[in-house]
């Protein structure tokens, strides 16, 4: 037994001797000896157990649980929302489950985050820009099939829409997607081959052109005009934003509504329009089943994901520009004013789902490559 357990036992020796003496005087010598042997053994065991219990530094509340750590991997623009939400969940979980939760957080482009998880970044939870990225992790064997049905809204926990950012005063009078087809209108956007945001941009343009022209041929023609007006395709949305704002390139920029709202909150003056025919940018959440099984974090990971759908968490998403998926939050006056209704809003499902979309638009030789070939970029 270590030294920290010996002191309480030592203090009890005199008490044991006194009791033993009393027993000896009360009973006969033979009976007393037998009784005292049993009594001393029991007393020593009892006192030793009491001493160990009293001084063991690892003992605490009988309901206390071992600390747990979660790794959250998400796309870059969610950082501010998660930094506000995580402390609320940690406090709630500690109060309800008597368990301390800490978070490791990683933020970056959705595509690069997807590759990192597949290559070994042991995320417990992934919150990505598009379901196609989550599906890649599923196909790598890390997420179980059917993850979309595990949580409300087909796993979509945050939403936005593409908007067109213009120069101060909108000198090119850009009001809709079709205005980006006009000769002499320079557009800044990223490459859909490398950027998740740019894929949403492309789909918004295609969706509007198809509904206006009524055929794939008309849509392809319209988007060829649009991309002819793009001087250079940047690698990602951040480079596109820098090219427009910092370098002064282009007459227009396509970006997430939430990015523009956040920029406005930081004091940056931004002029933008929300086209009436648009597409919902849906961002999914998923638990990485293989990793939570390895880490023993399934229970708390699932609880955190469920918490993200709560009005409390959805309010934090809305504060930084994401359209809430919780209807009660969406109906709050401040958010009704912040997020104008879009008259004709399509979804990925309306376009056939991500497998069909990737095959039709972004695979080698598909629509985007055909457009690039026509303009000989």
Regions from the PLM with identified roles:
Residues 53-194, 367-377:
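N-terminal segment of the mature folded domain
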Residues 5-39:
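Bacterial N-terminal signal peptides that target proteins for export
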Residues 2-4, 292-377:
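Extracellular/periplasmic juxtamembrane helices and adjacent flexible linkers that interface
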Residues 87-97, 178-243:
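Ligand-binding cleft/hinge of the Venus flytrap
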Residues 48-51:
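C-terminal motif of bacterial Sec signal peptides marking the signal peptidase cleavage site
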Residues 130, 191, 257-258, 320:
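Short secondary-structure boundary segments
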Residues 212-277, 284:
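Ligand-binding pocket segment of bilobal, Venus flytrap-like solute-binding proteins
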Residues 169-175, 194, 207-215, 291-301:
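Short helix-loop capping/hinge motifs at secondary-structure junctions, enriched
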């Amino acid at each position: 037994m270590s030294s920290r357990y010996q002191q309480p036992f030592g203090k009890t020796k005199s008490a044991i001797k006194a009791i033993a003496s009393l027993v000896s005087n009360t009973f006969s010598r033979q009976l007393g000896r037998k009784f005292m042997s049993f009594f001393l053994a029991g007393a020593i065991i009892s006192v030793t157990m009491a001493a160990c219990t009293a001084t063991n530094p690892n003992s605490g509340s009988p309901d206390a649980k071992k600390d747990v750590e979660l790794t959250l991997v998400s796309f870059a623009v969610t950082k501010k929302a998660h930094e506000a939400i995580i402390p609320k969940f940690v406090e709630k979980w500690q109060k309800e489950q008597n368990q301390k939760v800490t978070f490791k957080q990683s933020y970056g482009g959705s595509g690069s985050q997807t590759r990192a998880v597949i290559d070994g970044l042991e995320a417990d939870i992934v919150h990505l820009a598009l379901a196609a990225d989550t599906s890649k992790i599923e196909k790598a064997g890390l997420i179980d099939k059917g993850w979309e049905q595990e949580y409300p809204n087909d796993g979509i926990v945050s939403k936005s829409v593409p908007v067109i950012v213009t120069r101060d005063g909108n000198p090119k009078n850009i009001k809709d997607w079709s205005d980006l087809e006009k000769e002499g209108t320079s557009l800044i956007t990223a490459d859909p081959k490398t950027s998740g945001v740019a894929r949403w941009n492309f789909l918004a343009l295609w969706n509007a052109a198809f509904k206006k022209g009524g055929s794939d041929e008309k849509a392809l023609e319209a988007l060829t005009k649009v991309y002819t007006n793009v001087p250079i395709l940047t690698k990602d949305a951040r480079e596109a934003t820098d090219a427009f704002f910092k370098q002064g390139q282009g007459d227009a920029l396509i970006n997430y509504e939430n990015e523009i709202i956040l920029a406005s909150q930081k004091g940056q003056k931004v002029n933008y329009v929300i086209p009436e025919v648009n597409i919902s940018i849906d961002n999914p959440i998923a638990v990485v089943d293989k990793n939570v099984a390895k880490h023993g974090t399934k229970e708390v990971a699932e609880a955190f994901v469920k918490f993200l759908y709560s009005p409390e968490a959805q309010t934090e998403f809305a504060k930084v520009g994401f359209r809430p998926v919780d209807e009660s939050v969406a109906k709050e006056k401040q958010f009704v004013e912040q997020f104008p209704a879009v008259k004709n809003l399509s979804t990925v499902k309306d376009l056939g789902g991500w497998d069909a979309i990737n095959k039709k638009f972004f695979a080698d030789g598909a629509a985007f490559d055909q457009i690039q070939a026509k303009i000989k970029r």
